[in-house]
């Protein structure tokens, strides 16, 4: 394919559309540019949107591990009063509560999510135990013992309109925002799940540098003018 031979290596910053899996977006890009060597610096759940760092070419894909360890920033909405098995909007409802937390109670609970905290990976996650992804166990109705991990977080409450609680999070690699919503709901005594999630930043790459992921579905779309180097500069 002529396009593939002319295409530069580089970083393509994409705003992932809601409802798309991260890997379907990568497959679409692979088909569009005819280059098989494509990596990423962190996936997003299907219901989530925002910054996906796509790495094109050997020079960039071989440093994916470095970029994966960069901190990230999110805007999120938790739905209070309802819990799901997956801790997010795609899960099965497993509990409801009529308790309506006060704003003061929410601010007090949010203080826990500052600095270093311990998290247990949710069962509906891609983390592997004994060579098998946790969500594969979960779909079989199994619950596997998981080890806690240490993460760094900084959570800020931005708006509260029951049952919706809006917040932003800056966090280290491996942080589950779904778990934060779930844990916050437990602390408030009403339960909660993650309704919406948008990644605003991944390392030094921000949402305002991204192209709309829907553009990759256009067979004539040229990604070359949007490729960047590690400093975010257009190549």
Swiss-Prot record:
Transmembrane segments: none annotated. It catalyses: uridine(55) in tRNA = pseudouridine(55) in tRNA. InterPro entries: PsdUridine_synth_cat_dom_sf, PsdUridine_synth_N, tRNA_psdUridine_synth_TruB, TruB_C. CDD domains: PseudoU_synth_EcTruB. GO terms for molecular function: RNA binding; tRNA pseudouridine(55) synthase activity. PANTHER family: PSEUDOURIDYLATE SYNTHASE TRUB1, TRNA-PSEUDOURIDINE SYNTHASE. Responsible for synthesis of pseudouridine from uracil-55 in the psi GC loop of transfer RNAs. This is tRNA pseudouridine synthase B. The lineage of its organism: Bacteria, Pseudomonadati, Chlamydiota, Chlamydiia, Chlamydiales. The gene is truB.
